[in-house]
Each structure stands twice: as C-alpha cells, then as structure tokens.
C-alpha cells in the first residue's frame, strides 16, 4: 500500500496583532530609508489594547514623525474605529527608541563598503521547491493566498462584515515530494457581530476557499474548519498582544525548511538576519529554477564584524543533478554573500519593506523595487555552468 505524508503550514492576516507589529516596525524603517539610506535601524513594536510601544536602536540623520507613521499604519491595516477595539487615531504611542551601540557600529562600518562586516553572528536558511509555480512549499503558499483573499474582500467591501484579524492553516497530502491532495483547511476570521455563523461559513467557503485552492487538490474527504470556535468578534490587539518577530515561520517556509531564529521586520539590510535570509532564498530559488535540484535548502552563517560568511552549506534532499560540492562552488562563483554584496546584488537599500511584512516574505511580487530575491535571473548561467 502506498504511503502518504501530511504536512501543515499556517498564515495570518495583516490584522493579526503580531503582523501589525511587524508592519509598524517596517513602516518606520521605510520612512527612515526615504531620507537616509545609510541608517542603522532595529525597531521593535508591541501592540496591546489602546497602546503601541516602540523600542530598539536607530542611528540616522532622518527626521521622521514616528507617532504619525504608527497611526497611519494602524489605520491602514483597518483598525480605525473604537467599535473594532483599537483605533489608530486614539491609541497611545510610547516611543522608547534609542541609538545603536557604538561597539556594534565599529564592527559593521568600514571605510571600504565592500568590507562591511555582518551586523551580528548568526545562521540563516533559504529554501525552494519546484512543487509550486513560485517555487515555494504548497502548504504555506496556499495559506498565504487564503489570507490575501480575505484581505482583498474586506478592503473591497464585498464581505462587509469581515474584520482585519484572521488565520489560515492548510494540510497537504504528499506522494513523495509531490502534493497530491488537500487534507484539511482551517480558516478563522474576525467578523462583525451581525453575521450568523451559517452565513459566514458559506461565504468563506464560496468566496475565499473555493476561489483560492486548486479544485484538483480538493476532494470529498477534505475537511474544512471555518471559525470552528464559533464567534470571533474580539480580535486584533484586544484579543492578544502582538510583537515584532513572533511569526518567523509564517514569514518564511511554513516549517518546511529550517530557520536560523532571526526575525526580519524593523531591520535594515546591515542585519544579516534579514538580508542574508533573502539572499539564500535567492540562491535556492535560482538553483531550483535552473533544474540543478528539485528541492534546495541553503544555510549561511556569519561572525559579527566579519564580511565573509563563516560557512555555506546545502541540502538537496537527494534531488540534485550534480554533486553538492559542485553546487556550492557555483554559489561561491555567482553570488556575493558578503553583507555589502547582498545589499548591492538585491538592491536592498530601498523603502520597500512594509509590503513584505504581511502574507510572507517569499514567493511573492510587489512594487518594482520589492522582492528582488524572487528573481530567477541567475538560472540560465547556473544551468550552463552545471552542464545541464
């Protein structure tokens, strides 16, 4: 009898409190980068009923209105009325931002930009798989798209009873490395008190789930759990506190690949937690796009103040067409994984980070300057050099 494996990933909406915090942190980063491309930013956010608290270290020549940025971001997410439990115009904004330690700065800054050191030690992973068109794992890809659809319908007013907070979870059945069926779907969305559970469940099924998930993967045995606890009126920061960097698996590969532990939002590109994670996604995606492997996980590590990575390693899960040593040689030849090299290679000194802070950092397109790490412009030369 053939054996199947199940794998589950989740996503959350832009109105989830942790994602609110991420978006606020990245909105502040973007505002600073519009004035000062050489700023050092590490901005953390806490949201809870009636308050937004900012903490972290920022060194910049930019002069920004932090409070206004916070309020505009909260309102833009959809929390703009007291009936929702949180109002961007009336919430308290507590600013505890300071400056970056000069001891860190001396290890990062260099007279020659090429020798810019890593902002911290750490390890980062990048991953790609040919199981979806965007070379992402199917469970997280579909979970993100469910949340994007919820947001689109809410913002367009097509389902006017939708509120900003929501979560989705998708379980895929795999035959080897190939997803063959959706085993279970969980979707919970905040809503106005006026909507009945029966009407909500029907609308979510017809307008979100069936519009997003491939019909060929749904079957008679697929299980659906739509707002399984019943009412979900109280949500956002009223229901739960939110913190920057608490959705690192949602932000990346839904658990399908390993994670080095560092979060992304609120960090400028000198922080390799963010920039190097983007870089190794770029590496892995181009390797898979080139047909060198069907699945590829790349790990890179750094020492604080040192430009060159302390290690580069890969796992192709037995799907490689050339040896792993040959693949690593190609990586070293075609990708500059020093911090400054990454920033230049991916054009990361751009105010484009807020759009990455919800619905995942990978497998997406955005503005012209965003998601440069999703390009497959190295695939052709990698394939040629691999002799494929």
Curated annotation (Swiss-Prot):
It catalyses: L-methionine + ATP + H2O = S-adenosyl-L-methionine + phosphate + diphosphate. Mg(2+) binds at residue 18. It holds the Pfam family S-AdoMet_synt_M. InterPro entries: ADOMET_SYNTHASE_CS, S-AdoMet_synt_C, S-AdoMet_synt_central, S-AdoMet_synt_N, S-AdoMet_synthetase, S-AdoMet_synthetase_sfam. L-methionine binds at residues 57, 100, 240, 271. ATP binds at residues 16, 165-167, 231-232, 240, 246-247, 263, 267. It is an enzyme of class 2 (transferase). Its main location: cytoplasm. Coiled coil: none annotated. GO terms for molecular function: ATP binding; magnesium ion binding; methionine adenosyltransferase activity. Binds 2 divalent ions per subunit. It comes from the Bacteria. It is found in: Cytoplasm. Pathway: Amino-acid biosynthesis; S-adenosyl-L-methionine biosynthesis; S-adenosyl-L-methionine from L-methionine: step 1/1. K(+) binds at residue 44. Its EC number is 2.5.1.6. The keyword Heme does not apply. Keywords: ATP-binding, Cytoplasm, Magnesium, Metal-binding, Nucleotide-binding, One-carbon metabolism, Potassium, Transferase. Catalyzes the formation of S-adenosylmethionine (AdoMet) from methionine and ATP. The overall synthetic reaction is composed of two sequential steps, AdoMet formation and the subsequent tripolyphosphate hydrolysis which occurs prior to release of AdoMet from the enzyme. Belongs to the AdoMet synthase family. Homotetramer; dimer of dimers. This is S-adenosylmethionine synthase. The gene is metK.
